[in-house]
């Protein structure tokens, strides 16, 4: 543990930009997103869902927490953290993650063969285990139009086989436009939810939660004015809150302060502006 963490009684860095489910903060909107995704999966008759959000809004950590809570006795979940592939490559990864040998999948037959293998997988899961196949694709804005068109065909399988396939698309806002340009797929999206940034009244609880997970047992580490400035500068984007809070924490520790105050946050913000390290959207006055 480095010195500035020890200074504040922390076991680990509370503001690392990682998708560690322990640090998930269940804001009102994040709870709503998970409730809607759970409904989508549990219904087993709504074949496509779409969760979007700006970069840094917490989509990937929401995905991890959501899939961890799915009832695996009823559902078989396959997650792909990157969707920047062709349809054939994506479905091959789904099959490999489902336990099939890549050599057995083969390279001949293209999409038709992959559809056959997916049909067999979904049918086997339903008949032998009573489970539904759930495919979760993160960074889905990177899917090319052909892959999106092919994904739509998966919903057709639900009327043809003794199995069910639900696909959850997770991505940045441009995913919505990409889907809208393909009406046959757009019409199959049964659930849509856009994950907004944190509300102003949630910033303090967000920081406190992450600090407590990291080992903080004392009182509030960021004073009220510091929290307010962090929120205004970052516009409530969780990833940017983490970045500014981490730097402010380090600055406070270097000065042997017992808490992080507004002045310490201002120092970091001015330094970031001077080096043009704040996102363009946050470059104005706080």
Task: Walk through the language-model features, giving the residues of each.
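A short, basic N-terminal segment
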Residues: 1-45, 278-286
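Mid-core helix/loop region of P-loop NTP-binding domains shared across ATPases and GTPases
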Residues: 5, 86-89, 101-150, 159-162, ...
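Conserved NTP-binding/hydrolysis module of P-loop NTPases
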Residues: 10-17, 74-75, 85-105
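Walker A/P-loop nucleotide-binding motif
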Residues: 43-65
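Short regulatory helix/loop adjacent to the ATP-binding pocket of P-loop NTPases
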Residues: 66-70, 173-188
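Conserved AAA+ ATPase "SRH/arginine-finger" region at the nucleotide-binding site
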Residues: 80-84, 179, 190-203
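Conserved AAA+ ATPase "sensor/coupling" helix adjacent to the nucleotide-binding pocket
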Residues: 96-98, 172-173, 198-217
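C-terminal alpha-helical "lid" subdomain
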Residues: 104, 177, 212-286
